[in-house]
């Protein structure tokens, strides 16, 4: 069989499992698997040989995909663009029609940011919550959720009042071949998101104080005969030292907001407590609320 006689559907499945998946992270593979097996392939009313692929065929396919959910068009076109680039690179086709297809812009994410007064209410409530330290790390240091979960006590320099960001925790999923079905899930350590994500940050005293309190609490847990503690040195962990579920912090934030009549805010929203409306320049939490001694 000639390369150009290969069917698009067959190629996409082979490409995703054998070419694309080995070069991406597992979380990216999960999104890709959903896009291919739940959006693109079911929307192919008629399969087509690679040599007959055209702008018109792809536009019609993506139009059907886009009707499934708001982000489907964007994610479908994104995955097909990567696949078709490999199709052309491997000489299955001499011309790649994807760049000429109709674009489906990514919807701008809506990050809910609490105003100054609501943030004060939120912070007062958070100060009485077991997640207080994690919330402070998001608000004061602008850390991502995975970075917060990946922090270890060895990353903090109490003398210099700094923290080193050098890892994150992410979900590691194994999917059943040719399906969007999770067969195995674990939380594992990974390098930070980008090279620029490796950094050393100054940490305010109010945060360092909470880190020290957490450290003392964990030392007590280690000596508790009723707890089989696993010492991974994580700052944010379960009672037995195991990593937290990656959804746990957002769930805790939702409870705090609901109990205090506040709009729900996510961990990502904690990273953006205040933005200048004209320059969009990030302002630290303390430029809004003052020095640490004024915080609960």
Describe each region flagged by the PLM.
Residues 155-162, 245, 264, 283-296:
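Short, polar N-cap/turn motifs at the start of nucleic acid-interacting alpha helices
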Residues 4, 16-92, 108, 243-248, ...:
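N-terminal core-binding DNA-recognition domain of tyrosine site-specific recombinases/integrases
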Residues 6-11, 47-49, 152:
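Short, structural beta-strand-to-alpha-helix junction motif
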Residues 103, 117-118, 151-216, 220:
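Conserved tyrosine-mediated DNA breakage-rejoining catalytic core shared by Y-recombinases
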Residues 68, 73-76, 89, 93-95, ...:
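Basic, Lys/Arg- and aromatic-enriched nucleic-acid-binding interface segment
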Residues 105, 109, 169, 273, ...:
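Catalytic-site neighborhood detector that most strongly recognizes the C-terminal catalytic loop/helix
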Residues 1-6, 10, 60, 198, ...:
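Basic/aromatic DNA-contact patch characteristic of tyrosine site-specific recombinases
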Residues 70, 124, 128-129, 201, ...:
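Short, basic (Lys/Arg/His-rich) helix/loop patches that form interaction surfaces
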